[in-house]
A protein has these predicted regions:
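One-carbon transfer enzymes
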Residues: 1-200, 204
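Positively charged, low-complexity/disordered segments
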Residues: 203-205, 209-215
Length: 215
């Protein structure tokens, strides 16, 4: 598979690393622009960009993606099979979602539809959830509502905190991405059209599981 990887923070690194070491080809990385994060206003690259530079992978750090015709045309020219998206930091518009042959896949760190949206790991800890997990979904224009391709549940240990649980889920995301692609490739070989293992949550389920107000 020819893959373009979208990610920014440390959380994205296990997934990028597993694809770099896999049989798949990471033809480019898209990350957030460098930010001023230290004294002297020095620009610091994102963790994902830093890894891509070390691996000599083509890097894009657009300030704007929606309506960015030059960037969109550049992505189209790369003839990509799949976009892998994990903690990139922006919602991808329709004109980008439609570019890759097999769509855009995202890893979400909760058992959807619970904790759809921002900060799912934090909410699972705040609310004392016994279990959490990762879902791999095919992205659409809405937030965390795409078809669910693969999901795995894990127990939240009593001594888990934000750091330990974040690390567990980032590693699990990487594993599930590869598993989902293996299913896709198997179905391509069998001439079937989809690797769906689950269906999207119903509107009623989504209504029940909206993120609580921070007030």
């Amino acid at each position: 598979m020819r893959i373009i990887f979208w990610g920014t923070p440390e959380y994205s690194i296990p997934s990028l690393d597993i694809f770099i070491k896999s049989k798949h080809e990471v033809i480019a990385v898209v990350s957030q622009p460098d930010k001023k994060r230290s004294r002297g206003n020095k620009l610091i690259a994102s963790p994902v960009k830093s890894i891509a530079e070390k691996e000599s992978i083509k890097i894009y750090t657009p300030k704007k993606i929606r309506g960015n015709i030059d960037f969109i045309n550049e992505l189209k020219s790369l003839s990509c099979d799949l976009f892998i998206v994990i903690a990139y930091g922006k919602i991808l518009p329709k004109e980008i979602l439609e570019i890759p042959k097999f769509g855009c896949w995202n890893a979400h760190a909760s058992l959807l539809p619970r904790w759809r949206g921002a900060a799912p790991i934090q909410w699972s800890l705040i609310k004392g959830d016994e279990f959490t997990g990762v879902g791999i979904m095919k992205m659409n224009e809405e937030l965390d509502t795409g078809d669910l391709l693969l999901e795995e549940k894990i127990k939240i240990d009593n001594d888990d905190n934000l750091n330990t649980l974040t690390k567990k889920l980032s590693i699990l995301s990487a594993k599930l991405f590869l598993n989902a692609i293996s299913i896709l490739e198997e179905n391509i070989y069998k001439n079937t059209n989809s690797c769906l293992l689950y269906t999207s949550p119903s509107p009623r389920d989504r209504q029940k599981s909206r993120m609580p107000s921070s007030a």
